[in-house]
């Protein structure tokens, strides 16, 4: 069933990232996002305590997506990408927990486990606070 887990992970990532890309903030959003965008572009230090990993990875996205004109959109893409990865991680962790609770499920239980983990991860991706952080340059979801 590892192959099914991989297929479901790819489907989940694609669906979640697709929705995030459809609703992504194309320019500079409000609050701290502008600071994170400018620091990702210039490798600056945002307000204390700083977020060095987010800034370095955001800078990597700025450089990879050089063909996109808006720097803000490039950093917002980083947040959407890492948020979609978070959904996949939640799915994989849920499956690991299900396997620990019931190491030898029958076929029907296994289908229920996969469906539950997939739907939980999918729906959790669209909770208000998670979705809001996923479509703008914010540090919460990449962390």
State where each predicted segment sits.
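Membrane-interface helix-boundary signature
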Residues: 1-12, 72-78, 113
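Transmembrane signal-anchor helices characteristic of membrane glycosylation enzymes that use polyprenol
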Residues: 2-30, 124-125
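Hydrophobic transmembrane alpha-helices of multi-pass secondary transporters
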Residues: 8, 12, 37-39, 71, ...
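Transmembrane-helix motifs of polytopic, lipid-linked glycan transferases
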Residues: 10, 77-106, 125
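Membrane-water interface at transmembrane helix exits
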Residues: 19, 24-25, 58, 62, ...
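Aromatic- and kink-enriched transmembrane "portal" helix at the membrane-lumen/periplasm boundary
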Residues: 23, 68-76, 104-113, 120-141
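Extracytoplasmic catalytic/substrate-binding loops of multi-pass membrane glycan-assembly enzymes
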Residues: 24-36, 46-60, 73
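Specific aromatic-rich, kink-prone transmembrane helix
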Residues: 41, 89-95, 126, 130, ...
């Amino acid at each position: 069933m590892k192959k099914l887990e991989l297929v479901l992970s790819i489907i989940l990532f694609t669906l979640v990232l697709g929705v995030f890309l459809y609703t992504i903030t194309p320019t500079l959003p409000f609050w701290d996002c502008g600071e994170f965008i400018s620091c990702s572009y210039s490798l600056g230090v945002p307000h204390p305590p700083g977020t060095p990993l987010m800034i370095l990875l955001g800078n990597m996205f700025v450089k990879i997506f050089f063909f996109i004109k808006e720097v803000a959109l490039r950093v917002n893409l980083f947040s959407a990408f890492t948020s979609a990865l978070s959904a996949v991680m939640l799915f994989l962790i849920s499956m690991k927990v299900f396997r620990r609770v019931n190491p030898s499920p029958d076929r029907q239980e296994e289908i229920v486990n996969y469906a539950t983990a997939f739907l939980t991860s999918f729906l959790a991706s669209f909770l208000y606070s998670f979705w809001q952080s996923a479509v703008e340059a914010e540090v919460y979801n990449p962390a």
